[in-house]
Amino acid sequence: MTAWILLPVSLSAFSITGIWTVYAMAVMNRHVCPVENWSYNDSCSPDPAEQGGPKTCCTLDDVPLISKCGTYPPESCLFSLIGNMGAFMVALICLLRYGQLLEQNRHSWINTTALITGCTNAAGLVVVGNFQVDHAKSLHYIGAGVAFPAGLLFVCLHCVLFYHGATTPLDMAMAYLRSVLAVIAFVTLVLSGVFFLHESSELQHGAALCEWVFVLDILIFYGTFSYEFGAVSSDTLVAALQPAPGRACKSSGSSSTSTHLNCAPESIAMI
């Protein structure tokens, strides 16, 4: 077991704690309304008597979407930090898992596609975290439109990869757990998108709740990689970064692909 096992857990713990902290700050600073609030008005007149605590009069501008919670300072600063650090950890996890599967001689387009979608998810998170929705709406929506579907596709691809590699009852239990998380992610992302397109306050609030469930679900999924990361080593990172031609060497009389860095001895022997 290596220290790499802490990376997926750290991503989940850091990001989940961070976004809930951002939400709490946004509520206390009266930048959004609490998630338990379902009552929205067309407009609200400022009440000087109200100081501190959550808003009691809410409009559609106060719907507690995750992005909305991180729009204004000081919570926007923490939101950007979470987005940047979370994106780095996501990319590192994707790269290590990709290399781990290569070490197991599991060379497939699914593994490569999963790496691409995971890194795309990370890139989208950087854009979402650094371009707040009220200040750079187009860029923020582009980032979200890239990050969320890419994250969902990454989850689905790794469900397939893990299921086909499961060999023990514990592996199968983890495969079923990840499948459930993938289904929840798919349903909540679709519902969030559908609800968000409507101007109804109830549907907008429903979109916010679905978005929260989707993000938390994806973060929990990333945390489950600690199951495999006990076997990760520095060689795993080398395997992930190794150029494709070096991996594509086949041993004599076999169709299996070798993951060794140097195939020259084999070539000389064949000569």
Curated annotation (Swiss-Prot):
Expression by tissue: Widely expressed with higher expression in placenta, liver and kidney.
Keyword presence, Transmembrane: yes
Membrane topology, Cytoplasmic segments: 1-2, 97-108, 163-178, 233-271
A GO CC term attached to the entry: plasma membrane
Induction (UniProt): Up-regulated in the liver by fasting.
First-listed, main subcellular location of the protein, grouped into a coarse class: membrane
GO biological process: catabolic process; phosphatidylinositol phosphate biosynthetic process; protein localization to plasma membrane
Positions on the Extracellular side per record topology: 24-75, 130-141, 200-211
Subcellular location: Cell membrane
Signal sequence, renumbered to the chain: none
Protein keywords: Cell membrane, Glycoprotein, Membrane, Transmembrane, Transmembrane helix
Record bears the keyword Cell membrane: yes
Pfam families for this protein: Frag1
Membrane topology: Multi-pass membrane protein
Positions bearing carbohydrate: 37, 41
Residue intervals passing through the bilayer: 3-23, 76-96, 109-129, 142-162, 179-199, 212-232
Subunit structure: Interacts (via C-terminal cytoplasmic tail) with PI4KA.
General function of this protein: Possible role in fasting-induced catabolism. Regulates localization of phosphatidylinositol 4-kinase (PI4K) to the plasma membrane, possibly by reducing the association of TTC7 (TTC7A or TTC7B) with the PI4K complex. Acts as a regulator of phosphatidylinositol 4-phosphate (PtdIns(4)P) synthesis. May also play a role in fasting-induced catabolism.
Record-stated family: Belongs to the DRAM/TMEM150 family.
Name of the protein described by the UniProt record: Transmembrane protein 150A
Native source organism of the sequence: Rattus norvegicus
Taxon lineage: Eukaryota, Metazoa, Chordata, Craniata, Vertebrata
